[in-house]
Amino acid sequence: MQDGQIIERYVFPSPSPNVNLFMITYWSSGLRVKGLLAVPKKEGLYDGLLYLRGGIKSVGMVRPARIAQFASEGFVVFAPFYRGNQGGEGNEDFAGKDREDAFSGFELLKRNPKVDPDRIHIFGFSRGGVMALLTAIEKRDAASVVSWGGVTDMELTYEERKDLRRMMKRVIGGSPKKVPEEYKWRTPIYHLENLCCPVLIIHGGKDQNVSIEHAYRLEKRLKELGKRVTTWYFPNFTHYFPPAMNRKMVTSSCQWMKNQVLS
């Protein structure tokens, strides 16, 4: 079996009358991994969107309403749960080998008959920001990438989030001092030379889950390399935007993605 190949798919209750949802089991580096697929009901060829969730395990799990919301903007959306979740095989390792589940998710979208294979975008929220950037670096035919409240520097996350240190040491194999190479491997700002697509950074200035310093470091490095980058910074917002602004940002970011032309 090839990465991105669907093993099993069944209908999942959709919160939107215009979107079909499917629970998917797909192939990723020899593992059966789960995810959620959202497909607009209307016939046509759509842009694809790989939605990369934040958190780990049950924290930050993919929400059907969120996926349907993006699909309603005119995308076929696939959201991997990452290995080891919801009955999937393997174990998450926080942007280590589980990044392959995102890579395979990109291939899954390419195989979908309702997706334009040249118009696949990558969206990451929180920890998903790392996954999105690593996937865009790996998949050089990605049309664009969005990092919303996204982690970009894993060592900075270790420094800032004392509440996550125990988990990070367990899944990564130690602290940044003990295994610096593991943190560097998981930090996309060290690997942006190979990024080809435009980047949109969305971040709240009062974010205490993922500080805006992550966004600043990403922006700085992209500009040093002459990459295309757009920033939408909101000084008074935290990690979670107010509901009305959140909805507006979904629509605006989707429009931004559609406006990007793969050069």
Residue ranges and their predicted role:
Residues 2-42:
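N-terminal cap/lid segment of alpha/beta-hydrolase-fold proteins
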Residues 44-46, 51-90, 155:
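Short substrate-entry loop that stabilizes the transition state in hydrolases
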Residues 93-113:
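Alpha/beta-hydrolase active-site loop
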Residues 115-126:
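Alpha/beta-hydrolase fold nucleophile elbow
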Residues 133-179:
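Hydrolase active-site cap/lid region
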Residues 195, 201-203, 207:
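Short beta-strand/loop motif that positions the catalytic acidic residue
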Residues 208-214:
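Conserved alpha/beta-hydrolase "acid-adjacent" motif
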Residues 216, 224-263:
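C-terminal catalytic histidine-bearing segment of alpha/beta-hydrolase fold enzymes
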